[in-house]
């Protein structure tokens, strides 16, 4: 009987899905779909490859220098967020809201932005010569 109980416990813990509650810390390969995160969070340098962030809300969130390769950001809300120098290689962002979002220096290679909304930010730089 003890062996059967041990086997059941072992199977439950070894085959645990990588699911997280919305309050759990962000990490690799986790399903955070449909979560609403606090506005204006500093998540700079987050490690989120292969994560599911679909239908999640990240308003004015700092994702600068984050690694989000192969993640699903579809139908997420990311207005006024920053992804400066973030790695979004092969991420899926179908139908996501990126209005006033800053992607300066980000790796957007093979990202699927089909149906995503965005507003282009034009930055003006003043160069002074002496």
Predicted regions and their residues:
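Tandem repeat scaffolds
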Residues: 20-130
């Amino acid at each position: 009987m003890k062996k059967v109980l041990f086997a059941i416990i072992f199977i439950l813990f070894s085959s645990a899905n990588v699911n997280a509650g919305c309050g759990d810390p962000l990490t690799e390969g986790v399903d955070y779909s449909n979560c609403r995160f606090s506005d204006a969070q500093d998540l700079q340098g987050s490690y989120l490859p292969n994560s599911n962030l679909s239908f999640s809300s990240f308003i004015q969130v700092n994702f600068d220098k984050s690694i989000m390769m192969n993640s699903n950001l579809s139908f997420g809300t990311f207005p006024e967020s920053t992804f400066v120098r973030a790695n979004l290689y092969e991420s899926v962002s179908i139908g996501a809201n990126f209005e006033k979002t800053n992607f300066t220096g980000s790796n957007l290679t093979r990202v699927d932005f089909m149906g995503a909304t965005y507003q282009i930010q034009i930055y003006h730089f003043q160069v002074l010569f002496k």
